[in-house]
Amino acid sequence: MVTINTESALTPRSLRDTRRMNMFVSVAAAVAGLLFGLDIGVIAGALPFITDHFVLTSRLQEWVVSSMMLGAAIGALFNGWLSFRLGRKYSLMAGAILFVLGSIGSAFATSVEMLIAARVVLGIAVGIASYTAPLYLSEMASENVRGKMISMYQLMVTLGIVLAFLSDTAFSYSGNWRAMLGVLALPAVLLIILVVFLPNSPRWLAEKGRHIEAEEVLRMLRDTSEKAREELNEIRESLKLKQGGWALFKINRNVRRAVFLGMLLQAMQQFTGMNIIMYYAPRIFKMAGFTTTEQQMIATLVVGLTFMFATFIAVFTVDKAGRKPALKIGFSVMALGTLVLGYCLMQFDNGTASSGLSWLSVGMTMMCIAGYAMSAAPVVWILCSEIQPLKCRDFGITCSTTTNWVSNMIIGATFLTLLDSIGAAGTFWLYTALNIAFVGITFWLIPETKNVTLEHIERKLMAGEKLRNIGV
């Protein structure tokens, strides 16, 4: 631990240094998202070869996919404690180390049971990253760029997906699924190196009573010393509330409202159904008439590129367009896309589809993913990091992140079962209905938080304002 004295805390910094530090923090922490994206993408391409190698049933295929989410849900339960004890920085370090171990274990698995166990370890690592990185970024960013910095995390997720799809396509010619899974260890090592140079979160430092260090970090990140001191004072005011976590959740209705809203948001994100496209894209395109592995992987890569470019656009629009408009438009686009995709797949099931419907299926999949990438994918993480009161932020985000992974596990573990029971059309139309419902929930319940400080949101929440008004 580096001790920063008062003199260093008063050292002036140039605007260029401030911008460089903000960029470094954003990119370094967002590498955690890259790891998440790599694991999402790599299993889509590796699963057909793993299925052939171990002769897997549909149920075991679902477990190979969803075991990562199971581990993430388990890891999320301990994230609050880990983040409070070690801080955001060293929580990221722990996640990166586990990611290396899980990747190597997956690559050298000699049985499906060993593979599932290794993917549970990967899941714990991903769960730590998905909790800690958005939280860290929200606490490091000023209110006018907070959405952009957290969206950088989602952009890195999509970049990871695209890189995984590219890697899968390259290795698909030889069917080397072990190389597909083992290559994930490389960016995890990069994250370990980058985390060494990251500063601790000023809010975590203040919570530990290390106010001089907290001010020094804020001075590294804010345009002026006055802004740094003003923000530190706001943090101190927020910390005057003594109770925290579970104790505060039990006795304070407003805290419960924030926690339940975060859980609802994460469930909504997952039950859009978009991650089943990421996990099972080759299978979906096989149902859509693409018969060869090469055709399926190329179509999958196109979807990944769509995800990445749409997320890139979202990075520069989320702080301008606002959270609520993005969600309402995104859910509407996903509802339309899944509706038409279900129709296309029904024609293939009936044997009445033309070749043009194959490409329409790809187009609808791209539309769904673009809608997701520009709305629920980044915005839900942004909102969940913004709405929790500081004194119980670890607890609140632990609850919402756990909900994300449990919901993620459910959709991953039920997709093939749904296909067998209600068909491809019924499966995607189920997600159409859910997305329509989410438009209404967004309109009536979700707050707009753009360009608002975390402390302002907390004051409105604790004053008992309606949830949709806490950002006003």
Swiss-Prot record:
One Gene Ontology cellular component annotation held by this UniProt entry: plasma membrane
GO process terms (BP): fucose transmembrane transport; L-arabinose transmembrane transport; transmembrane transport
Principal location: membrane
Regulation of protein activity: Symport activity is inhibited in the presence of the uncoupling agents carbonyl cyanide m-chlorophenylhydrazone (CCCP) and tetrachlorosalicylanilide and 2,4-dinitrophenol. Activity is partially inhibited by N-ethylmaleimide.
Transmembrane segments: 30-50, 64-84, 92-112, 115-135, 155-175, 179-199, 258-278, 298-318, 326-346, 362-382, 405-425, 426-446
Mode of membrane association: Multi-pass membrane protein
Induction: Induced by arabinose. Transcription is dependent on the transcription factor AraC, the cAMP receptor protein (CRP) and cAMP.
UniProt family annotation: Belongs to the major facilitator superfamily. Sugar transporter (TC 2.A.1.1) family.
PANTHER family: PROTON MYO-INOSITOL COTRANSPORTER
NCBIfam families: SP
Name the record gives this protein: Arabinose-proton symporter
